[in-house]
């Protein structure tokens, strides 16, 4: 299945999402949304991820009529606590100390706003982080890699050393579940060509 020349827009400033989307669509436009990503503590993490993804896509939709706009937001959860991107190095250290030696959930809310229909869905994967020493945590933070990642690590980069195992979609853990995205695009009548 390959896309035709229909307009596809990614509402994200994440280089990882751009990289992932290029694996299935060689051509698309990137138009980041600059909405404030605010969590509603009264909602489940899955609903927060969906709502933020939808807000990202819908915020730019008026600028792209007759297009399919993709929004996504990734959260990490453990024991009912939600971890987004760390605010600073101290916060990254706190997050990694909480995750180390434990299994957590990575939830990506994905939304597709099509010309006729909007669909969103949360996708969940599980990741088990091995026990980490204080030095391993500090050395990893010193690389700068954790600073723009939900959960303060990147499974596909240097942070892979700390991952003992995972289940579910790896592209979901990175930030954009590709198989599930294709299903949402089909449901919004994205015109794939054979």
Question: Where are the language model's segments positioned?
Answer:
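N-terminal beta1-alpha1 ligand-phosphate binding loop
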Residues: 3-26
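Cofactor-binding loop segments of dinucleotide-utilizing enzymes, especially the Rossmann-like FAD-
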Residues: 13, 33, 115
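Anionic-ligand binding patches
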Residues: 2-9, 44-194
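A short beta-strand-loop structural module common to alpha/beta enzyme folds
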Residues: 28-39
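Generic domain-boundary/flexible-linker signal
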Residues: 19, 39-41, 121
């Amino acid at each position: 299945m390959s896309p035709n020349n229909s307009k596809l827009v990614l509402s994200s400033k994440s280089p990882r999402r751009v990289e992932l989307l290029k694996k299935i669509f060689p051509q698309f436009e990137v138009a980041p949304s600059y909405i404030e990503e605010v969590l509603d503590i009264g909602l489940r993490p899955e609903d927060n991820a969906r709502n933020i993804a939808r807000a990202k896509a819908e915020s730019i939709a008026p600028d792209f009529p007759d297009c399919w706009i993709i929004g996504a937001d990734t959260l990490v959860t453990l024991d009912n606590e939600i971890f987004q991107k760390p605010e600073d190095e101290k916060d990254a250290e706190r997050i990694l100390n909480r995750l180390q030696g434990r299994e957590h959930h990575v939830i990506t809310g994905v939304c597709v706003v099509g010309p006729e229909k909007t669909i969103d869905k949360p996708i969940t994967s599980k990741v088990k982080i091995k026990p980490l020493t204080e030095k391993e945590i500090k050395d990893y933070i010193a690389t700068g890699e954790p600073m723009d990642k939900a959960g303060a690590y990147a499974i596909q980069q240097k942070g892979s050393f700390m991952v003992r195992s995972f289940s579910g979609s790896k592209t979901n853990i990175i930030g954009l579940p590709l198989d599930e995205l294709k299903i949402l695009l089909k449901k919004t009548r994205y015109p794939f060509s054979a």
